[in-house]
Amino acid sequence: MLPEQSAFGRSAMPGSDAVNPGPSPFAPPPNSFSGDFLGLSLPDEEHLWGMSPLSSSMPSWNGKNEQMFSNPNLERDLKHSHVRNGQPTPPPYGDNKTHTVGDLYSLSQCQFSNGAQNFQTHNDRRSFCEQSAINSNGGSSKRRKVRDAKMTQAEYNEQQQEKAKREKFLERNRLAASKCRQKKKEHTQLLESRYREQSDKKEQLVSEIARLRSEILGLKNEVLKHAQCGDEPIKLHLAQMVKKITYNDTTAPDLTDVPDAASSSEGPMTPRPQQALSFGFDDPLHLEPSRADGSTDHSVRRDSEASVLTENSYAFSTDESFDDLINV
């Protein structure tokens, strides 16, 4: 192999990254290659580098061009370049290391893995957003549930307070009603006891009235037994009783015609002072006005009383109308 060919091989293939089968953009113009280089072929290196045979119009290679293509900066740029869609691309920023052919595949795998990782990161971010939205919705629903629970608790507490107030109000009403019933029962029992007492007292009074009437009747019978004794007060009392009986018999029809006459202060009730005088025959003061009239009047009265106290008058006093004498 000629020195030009080796120099061209070094300059044409600066690194393992230039795998593009097309013409390199860093190749010299066609008129810069020598004529004796056209007949050379690189069959052993074509399968490695993927280079097509050089055209016949390429001129001969000179050392000046070799020095130009042997620039280490260009080799470094070519080593760090990437070929995409048939065009070399600049290396990643901050990459100062040289790469081999195996590094290209690892770099492509790394780029693919980075893309997959970015896609996975995007999916994770989206799932995180969805999870955040779900959590926010769940949190809002939880807050709503908590708020509803608080409202329900407040309503329950309010209902319990109202129920307690209602129970207290009903308890007071029941207590007041119980006291009222107890008081009414005690009042009823008091009235019943007073009724029994008054009934017993009434029975006692009725029995006392009956006893007194029987006693009055016995006393009047004793007075009638002494009617023939000649005692002036007894004779006067009997005469007044006879007058009252006869007066009641004569005024009975008038009283039936005029029922209000008994309730009036004037009328047949005028003889009551005489009744008082008749029961006061033991008192000599009631007889003094009659004695002041004179001896003649007194003698006439005695004669009239003697005429009244006959057997006929005594028989009249002992008939069925004698019950009226009891009430005199």
Curated annotation (Swiss-Prot):
Database matches in PROSITE patterns: BZIP, BZIP_BASIC
Disruption phenotype: Increases sensitivity to osmotic and oxidative stresses, but also to cell wall-damaging agents such as Congo red or iprodione. Shows increased resistance to low caspofungin concentrations, but is more sensitive to higher caspofungin concentrations. Leads to attenuated virulence.
GO CC entries: nucleus
Keyword DNA-binding belongs to the record: yes
Domain bZIP: 163-226
Matching Gene3D superfamilies: 1.20.5.170
Induction record: Expression is induced in during osmotic stress and repressed in the absence of the mitogen-activated protein kinase sakA. Expression is also highly induced at low and high caspofungin concentrations.
Spans annotated as Leucine-zipper: 205-219
Biased composition (Basic and acidic residues): 283-305
Record's keyword terms, sorted: DNA-binding, Nucleus, Stress response, Transcription, Transcription regulation
Biased composition (Polar residues): 262-277
One record GO biological process: regulation of transcription by RNA polymerase II
UniProt biased composition (Pro residues): 22-31
Places the protein is found: Nucleus
Disulphide bond pairs: none
An example molecular function term from Gene Ontology annotations: DNA-binding transcription factor activity, RNA polymerase II-specific
Region (Basic motif): 163-202
Coiled coil: none
Pfam families in alphabetical order: bZIP_1
Region (Disordered) residue spans: 1-39, 250-313
Role noted for this protein: Transcription factor that acts as a key player in the regulatory circuit that integrates secondary metabolism and cellular response to oxidative stress. Regulates the genes involved in development, as well as osmotic, oxidative, and cell wall stresses. Participates in the caspofungin paradoxical effect (CPE), where fungi grow beyond the minimum inhibitory concentration of caspofungin. Plays a role in virulence.
Family: Belongs to the bZIP family. ATF subfamily.
Protein's recorded name: Basic leucine zipper (bZIP) transcription factor atfB
